[in-house]
Swiss-Prot record:
The gene is yxeR. Belongs to the EutH family. Pfam families: EutH (PF04346). InterPro entries: EutH. It is found in: Cell membrane. This is Uncharacterized protein YxeR. GO terms for molecular function: ethanolamine transmembrane transporter activity. GO terms for cellular component: plasma membrane. Keywords: Cell membrane, Membrane, Transmembrane, Transmembrane helix, Transport. PANTHER family: ETHANOLAMINE PERMEASE EUTH-RELATED, ETHANOLAMINE UTILIZATION PROTEIN EUTH. It is a multi-pass membrane protein. The chain crosses the membrane at residues 6-26, 49-69, 79-99, 111-131, 143-163, 167-187, 206-226, 236-256, 307-327, 333-353.
Amino acid sequence: MTVNDAVVFILAAFLLWGAADYCLGNRWGLGERFADGFKAMGPLALSMIGIVSLAPVLAAILIPIVAPFYTAIGADPSSFANTILAIDMGGYALAGEMAKDPQAGLFSWVFLGTMMGPAIVFTIPVALGIIEKEDHPYFAKGILIGLCTVPIGCLIGGLCAGFDIGMIGKNLLIPSLLSAVIAFGLWRYTDRMIQLFHLFGKAVSMVAIIGLAAVSVETMTGIVLIPGMENVETGIQTTGTIAIALAGAFPMTAFITKTFKKPLQALGKCLHLDETATAGLVTSLAHHIPMLASLKDMTPRGKVINVAFAVSGAFVLGSHLGFVAGMKKEMAAAMIIGKLAGGVTAAAAAAWMTPAQSAKQQKRISASHS
């Protein structure tokens, strides 16, 4: 049995445990998380089915534009899609359509699509609607640090997956350059960059809904609104496969969080993090929205470390594990290693760049929030 097989069997075991707990009235707190996995099909369908169906159309538009430039530097066009899109928001579907080299396409959606893409299209736009305005500087600093370590996570994950280092390097050239540009923009023009990301996130969501509406009308009536779209069954099958994996991943994350609560709190103390910040890091392993919601209650150090870690580390035991295990289980272990490598190095850099505050300073911050 390979490591990837072991990961899938562990997910299956937690799925069964969650299902049993659901039948027994959520006695261990896993049944609710099991149900959450299948309930995720709705949001997944809204963001994915339209993009999956539109993938051939979008690829036909984008390939003539980006392919010559990427080919000139020896990179694959598929890495473009996952530099700006998460795997579950179009990155996976577009990588399949745009890839000239299947290995490069696989590398792109498994690693760039779980680190770089989610930060651009989801983390930054979504966070803006959650965090307090006074936390924008800490958020920008965390994103800046987190983006700088994305290439590290992709490199380590790619090597663990057995990809050629030359291919990895070529396909990380443009993402690394874009990371540097974004980092500079967040440093010098924070408010403008934040507005830009907000608009980009809205634009991607609109494209997804337009695609979903068009393929739904075509399925119901046979009337083709957008020629060249993939049939709706492909998107539905993809979301269903991911939901099955999530029904195991969510209970597993709940179990880890509960079982290792004390050791994780001890680790937080070593990093000079308060309890809220430590809990945020653990929560981000499954999903970072609860962490972002509690950002206002953290110290500045905790805020920066949490955001930096989330760029690569968020969803590693949640939807990204569910997606990769469902679509290409051979990549599951390497994806986990790569995302954690990117997240941990970002958190370490953030800890080094953001000094721990004195107890007196922390009391002052707590008083300002009470």
